[in-house]
């Protein structure tokens, strides 16, 4: 299921650099993480939904590239974000 406007606002408020921040890597990674979690739950129920599985793999790849970018520009921001989101690294 797609994220509602309220869910997006809450995520952006928590992870963005300021109130209306939508473009920072932290905000983008947080939104992707929520979408990935939702798709993962969907695929647990609908195991043969291969179109959604492909979409999930694309989202994971996009998040991986953003995480790599933020780790190269500022290691402290990277470590903080990984800890806050509870991602493995």
UniProtKB/Swiss-Prot annotation:
Gene: rpsO
UniProt cross-references to InterPro entries, sorted A to Z: Ribosomal_uS15, Ribosomal_uS15_bac-type, uS15_NS1_RNA-bd_sf
Keyword Hydrolase (UniProt): no
Gene Ontology MF term list: rRNA binding; structural constituent of ribosome
Organism: Mycobacterium tuberculosis (strain ATCC 25618 / H37Rv)
Domain of life: Bacteria
UniProt keyword list: Ribonucleoprotein, Ribosomal protein, RNA-binding, rRNA-binding
Homology family: Belongs to the universal ribosomal protein uS15 family.
GO biological process annotation, one example: translation
Upper classification of the organism: Bacteria, Bacillati, Actinomycetota, Actinomycetes, Mycobacteriales
Protein name: Small ribosomal subunit protein uS15
CDD domains in the record: Ribosomal_S15p_S13e (cd00353)
Subunit organization: Part of the 30S ribosomal subunit. Forms a bridge to the 50S subunit in the 70S ribosome, contacting the 23S rRNA.
Keyword Metal-binding: no
